[in-house]
């Protein structure tokens, strides 16, 4: 068993089984680290809690909803505005967050009255918003507040509102992944099947496990619209509360992030017979194959092929321009969950990068299995790393860039390594054909930034300003390519706009052919 023991964690021997170095000819039965277990006492984990997984990851991207946390303000603040899940309703869910602000007296005497008062105040403050999600936290779960009963009372008193209750306190799982499961099943049990659509087209999908980071969802919806597919709901990025209550009427669940949303897909299949189809919106070849799979399900392959041909012709020469300049650069792929396997093979094959490490903070064994299988010999795989282990890995592997979250990204920069935000992006969207070129552009800019040269200078030297001029990114990158590539008339840099989403929103999408209207919809299966 090729376990990798970090020097900094020798005092915690249990950590040894949570990191492996992939050896030559290794099969997955002998090179997987342990995963999705409780954090070992003594190691400072970078994980979030189950409440965070429910509210921050899945709940809050819903756009037309008052999201209120029943607990202390700290829980609310920690899950506010750290992910860029934009929406087409002026980003209401990003601008405003709500909390009941539970204090010591409420812990002693109960906080149900406070919750009810806060819910009414929130609805009064935003009279145009008629939907609300209430999130239970550790504090109010431990004192036994009956949030479901309070939600029912508020709905009865106001008449025109609807409230969803998410009971996912922080202790409900070993990481945020526990919260993913909680909110998936709670939404299905409480809300799916409670609203019927006015309109159903010939080809209808739910787009599941997509959170519209900097517009990812809107890019993918544009492809589906161009194929003549009606997207009934998106779970949950840029999705509306009531459309998600109609999920039972789709013909197909198209699943993007399996780690956070496979649970609701599997239950929709079991309860309503809706098939599940896993796709990948990152990378040219994975995305092209994903569009083909969806098209094949509906028998509209020609429409998918037309889109793929158009997008390849426009964006592939630009991707290849960056690939020539990124070949051989080493990357540590340290995101949260499924991106470690969504990205690992695509960035190697399509950008020329070499993945030297993958890690996950809340991924399960299945995520590691897929991630490690897509890495080459010598890749270091780590489950639930702490900061000191990450630093030791950086010193050992010497990556040129790291893809990770904002918190680890800050200490990564202190070690002289550039990072790109794998959770919320730098200049996204990164999904779609153009998005993948934007990602390559951001990698290129980060690796070849003159700031890296300046950061390495000893500015205390008296002649530093004279002897240490710096080169531009393009000058540095072009040192590594041939003249044929450098002066190619086919390959060229990214030509898209800074905001690639505004144009998508401005398009007039044709309504797909009608299959049946609401009065023809039969009651959902029990």
UniProtKB/Swiss-Prot annotation:
Quaternary assembly: Hexamer of two alpha, two beta, and two delta chains.
Binding, [8Fe-7S] cluster: 49, 75, 138
Region (Disordered): 507-526
SUPFAM superfamilies linked to this entry: Helical backbone' metal receptor (SSF53807)
Protein name: Nitrogenase iron-iron protein alpha chain
First-level EC class: oxidoreductase
Miscellaneous notes: The structure of the 8Fe-9S-C-homocitryl cluster is assumed to be analogous to the 7Fe-Mo-9S-C-homocitryl cluster.
Reaction(s) catalysed by this chain's protein: N2 + 8 reduced [2Fe-2S]-[ferredoxin] + 16 ATP + 16 H2O = H2 + 8 oxidized [2Fe-2S]-[ferredoxin] + 2 NH4(+) + 16 ADP + 16 phosphate + 6 H(+)
UniProt gene name: anfD
Entry keyword annotation includes Iron-sulfur: yes
InterPro entries: Nase/OxRdtase_comp1, Nase_asu, Nase_comp1_asu, Nase_comp1_CS, Nase_Fe-Fe_asu
A Gene Ontology biological process term: nitrogen fixation
Keyword Iron on entry: yes
Natural source organism: Rhodobacter capsulatus
PROSITE patterns linked: NITROGENASE_1_1, NITROGENASE_1_2
Listed GO MF terms: ATP binding; iron-sulfur cluster binding; metal ion binding; nitrogenase activity
């Amino acid at each position: 068993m090729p376990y990798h023991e970090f020097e900094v964690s020798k005092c915690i021997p249990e950590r040894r089984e949570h990191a492996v170095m992939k050896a030559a000819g290794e099969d997955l039965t002998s090179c997987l680290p342990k995963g999705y277990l409780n954090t070992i006492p003594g190691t400072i984990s970078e994980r979030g809690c189950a409440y965070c997984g429910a509210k921050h990851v899945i709940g809050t991207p819903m756009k037309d909803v008052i999201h209120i946390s029943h607990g202390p303000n700290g829980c609310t603040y920690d899950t506010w505005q750290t992910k860029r899940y934009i929406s087409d309703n002026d980003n209401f869910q990003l601008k405003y967050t709500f909390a009941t602000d539970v204090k010591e007296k409420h812990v002693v005497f109960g906080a149900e009255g406070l919750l009810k008062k806060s819910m009414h105040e929130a609805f009064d403050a935003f009279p145009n918003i008629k939907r609300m999600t209430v999130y239970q936290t550790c504090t109010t779960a431990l004192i036994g507040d009956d949030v479901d009963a309070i939600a029912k009372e508020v709905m009865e008193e106001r008449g025109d509102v609807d409230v969803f209750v998410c009971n996912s306190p922080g202790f409900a799982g070993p990481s945020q992944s526990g919260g993913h499961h909680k909110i998936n099943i709670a939404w299905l049990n409480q809300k799916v099947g409670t609203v019927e659509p006015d309109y159903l087209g010939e080809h209808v999908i739910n787009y599941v496990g997509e959170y519209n980071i900097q517009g990812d969802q809107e890019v993918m919806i544009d492809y589906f619209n161009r194929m003549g597919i009606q997207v009934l709901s998106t779970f949950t990025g840029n999705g509306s509360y009531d459309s998600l209550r109609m999920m039972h009427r789709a013909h197909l669940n198209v699943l993007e992030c399996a780690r956070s949303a496979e649970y609701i897909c599997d239950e929709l299949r079991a309860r309503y017979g809706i098939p599940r189809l896993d796709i990948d919106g990152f990378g040219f070849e994975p995305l092209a194959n994903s569009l083909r799979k969806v098209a094949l399900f509906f028998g509209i392959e020609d429409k998918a092929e037309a889109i793929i041909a158009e997008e390849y012709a426009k964006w592939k020469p630009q991707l290849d321009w960056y690939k020539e300049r990124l070949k051989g650069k080493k990357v540590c792929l340290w995101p949260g969950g499924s991106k470690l396997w969504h990205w690992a093979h695509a960035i190697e094959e399509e950008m020329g990068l070499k993945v030297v490490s993958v890690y996950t903070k809340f991924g399960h064994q299945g995520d590691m299995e897929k991630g490690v299988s897509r890495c080459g010999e010598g890749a270091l795989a780590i489950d639930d790393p702490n900061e000191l282990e990450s630093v030791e890995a950086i010193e050992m592997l010497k990556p040129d860039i790291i893809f990770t979250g904002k918190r680890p990204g800050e200490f990564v920069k202190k070690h002289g390594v550039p990072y790109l935000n794998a959770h919320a992006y730098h200049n996204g969207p990164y999904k779609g054909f153009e998005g993948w070129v934007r990602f390559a552009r951001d990698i290129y800019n980060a690796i070849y930034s003159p700031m890296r040269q300046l950061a390495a200078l000893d500015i205390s030297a008296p002649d530093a300003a004279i002897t240490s001029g710096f080169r531009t990114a393009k000058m540095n990158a072009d040192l590594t390519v041939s003249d044929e590539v450098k002066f190619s008339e086919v390959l060229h840099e990214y030509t898209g706009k800074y905001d690639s989403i505004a144009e998508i929103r401005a398009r007039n999408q044709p309504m797909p052919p009608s299959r049946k209207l609401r009065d023809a919809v039969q009651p959902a299966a029990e």
